[in-house]
Design a protein with these regions (language model features):
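Conserved, structured core segments of small domains
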Residues: 1-120
Length: 120
């Protein structure tokens, strides 16, 4: 699959990572980047919850094996409109994959939630 980076050549991987680094520099120069990180592969994920008896961490492997989609990274941007966020997401979507061809990555766009006002 074009999404399985284990099958990419080193040059393809370098081109992809280079694209993402350059993209982050562009967002920073545009004054919209709040934060961005790539994440480790899903095989390194762990699911943690508090133990019911003593609250100690209970750690299991995750995510679930049947999951085919996963979060590879994220950006937090500060923009004036949803349309501006969509345009930025479309730019990220064309990151190169195998053979240098655009991947057309599906980018999920969500607003950062605001907490309801708390009365003193």
């Amino acid at each position: 699959s074009e999404w399985d980076v284990k099958n990419w050549t080193m040059d393809e991987l370098k081109a992809h990572v280079g694209f993402m680094k350059d993209f982050n520099v562009q967002l920073k120069s545009e004054g919209v980047l709040v934060g961005a990180e790539g994440l480790a592969p899903p095989g390194q994920a762990r699911i943690v919850r508090a133990g019911k008896k003593d609250g100690a961490p209970e750690v299991t492997d995750g995510p679930f094996a049947e999951s085919k989609e996963f979060l590879a990274g994220y950006w937090i941007i500060h923009v004036d409109s949803p349309e501006q966020a969509y345009a930025i997401a479309a730019r990220a979507s064309i990151a190169p994959g195998p053979g240098g061809k655009p991947l057309y990555i599906p980018i999920e766009v969500r607003e950062v939630a605001s907490a309801p006002p708390v009365e003193p």
